[in-house]
Regions:
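TPR/TPR-like (Sel1-like) alpha-helical repeat modules
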Residues: 186-191
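Structural detector for internal amphipathic alpha-helices that build alpha-solenoid repeat scaffolds
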Residues: 2-21, 29, 37-51, 56-59, ...
Length: 202
């Protein structure tokens, strides 16, 4: 391990320890660290110390490193969707790991962020990365907004992992289109999709 890498590991450990000790000042000092993994750890440490400010997340979502942006998106899951930070624009991030984290967090926030259903639907039906599509359709199911149903239904014809998530995401919805999608899923060639359909249909 090179000297610089060793130093970064040491700083990352120090940031994590600061969070466990509730030392917000020490944790905050690592937000400006040159190493992205240290900055990301500092965000988590501040959250653990209950000192993570909205401004910290907003700044981190604009960080040049995807590692930091993804961590900030994850931590935003703990905040109501009607306050900053806004995750809708983050769902258009160039890095798939950030989009995945923002999609997951969007499904966790209560109340949901205004306008996020449309952004999640766009990811569900149009993102190149299937992991992002999977995370987005799961979030649509968690939110349960009827305007997201068309995207969920479209995802039931995607690749197996996305189909399975889409079928599970149908749980809060009802109507003939939902019933038809579940019926199709019961005879899907993938056993996990069939199992998901059975679980939702019970």
């Amino acid at each position: 391990m090179g000297r610089q890498m060793a130093d970064a590991v040491t700083r990352r450990r120090a940031a994590a320890v600061a969070g466990h000790r509730g030392d917000a000042a020490a944790a905050r000092s690592f937000l400006a660290d040159p190493e992205p993994s240290v900055r990301a750890t500092a965000l988590g440490a501040l959250a653990r110390a209950r000192s993570l400010a909205t401004a910290d997340l907003v700044a981190a979502l604009a960080d040049p490193s995807a590692v930091v942006r993804a961590r900030a998106a994850e931590l935003a899951a703990n905040l109501p969707g009607d306050v900053d930070p806004v995750l809708g624009p983050v769902l258009d991030d160039a890095d798939a790991s950030v989009v995945e984290a923002a999609a997951w967090a969007s499904g966790e926030r209560r109340p949901p962020e205004p306008g996020v259903v449309a952004a999640l639907a766009t990811v569900t039906t149009g993102h190149d990365d299937p992991i992002c599509r999977e995370a987005a359709v799961a979030a649509l199911g968690a939110i349960g907004d009827p305007t997201g149903l068309p995207a969920v239904l479209a995802a039931t014809t995607d690749r197996p992992a996305v189909r399975r998530r889409a079928v599970l995401a149908l749980a809060p919805f009802d109507g003939p289109e939902v019933e038809a999608a579940l019926e199709r899923a019961l005879t899907d060639r993938d056993w996990q999709v069939r199992q998901a359909a059975e679980d939702v249909s019970r």
